[in-house]
Amino acid sequence: MLEPLNTLLAAPNPHFVNRAEAGGDIIPLSHITFPPASAIAVAALEDALQGSDTVLPALYRESDGLQLFANRADSDECFFLLPLAHMAAEKAALYEWLLTDDENCEDGDAVYGVPIWWDSAVVFAGFGQAPERFYLATAGAHRGKVFYFNHEECSMRIADSVAGFLDLLCADPVTFMQRFYDVAYWDIATYHPA
């Protein structure tokens, strides 16, 4: 379940290489783990998830948040899994962004404004220096699905599960970053773990 992520974390010298036409620069990266979340905090997460996911609790039993693909020259350029203690504040901040949409509706994979199941959603990941966030629906028709909030458009369902989300992230980090991160890594062409 966490094997692709653990493989990523074990990379001895992770780096991106920019496209040749952009100079071919190497961007040294780091993947940062933290001490495990407390049993009480993980139990609270499990309660919030309402049985919609088992991957996040397993992950937080190993590390209370993660920083992945962090630029060694500027660690704020990164993808992160939030520490459990920050999830409520990030959800409140994302709610303010969702309120800026003029409509509240769902259209296939797209969600505009505040979804009807928002109260039970869990905001768990995002990018440094950007308002983009990832959240999990824990109730309703999208229960267990992962959504990506893009502050210039709407929220989009991008994975049918947290495991599927981690597969997207770990299997092709370049495509993941270029698809979802609007602040940095525009010119990357390849990812190398060593």
Regions found by a protein language model. Name each.
Residues 1-129, 181, 192-194:
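A surface-exposed partner-binding patch
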Residues 121, 133, 145-146:
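Beta-sheet entry/capping signal
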Residues 124, 157-159:
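Local beta-strand/beta-hairpin segments that build beta-sheet-rich folds
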Residues 127, 139, 150:
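Acidic surface patches and DE-rich sequence motifs
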Residues 129-131, 153:
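Glycine-centered tight beta-turn/hairpin loop motif at sheet-sheet or coil-to-beta transitions
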Residues 132-139:
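Short, surface-exposed beta-strand/loop micro-motifs that present aromatic residues
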Residues 142-153:
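Intrinsically disordered, low-complexity regulatory segments enriched in Ser/Thr/Pro
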Residues 160-194:
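Acidic, proline/glycine-rich low-complexity IDRs
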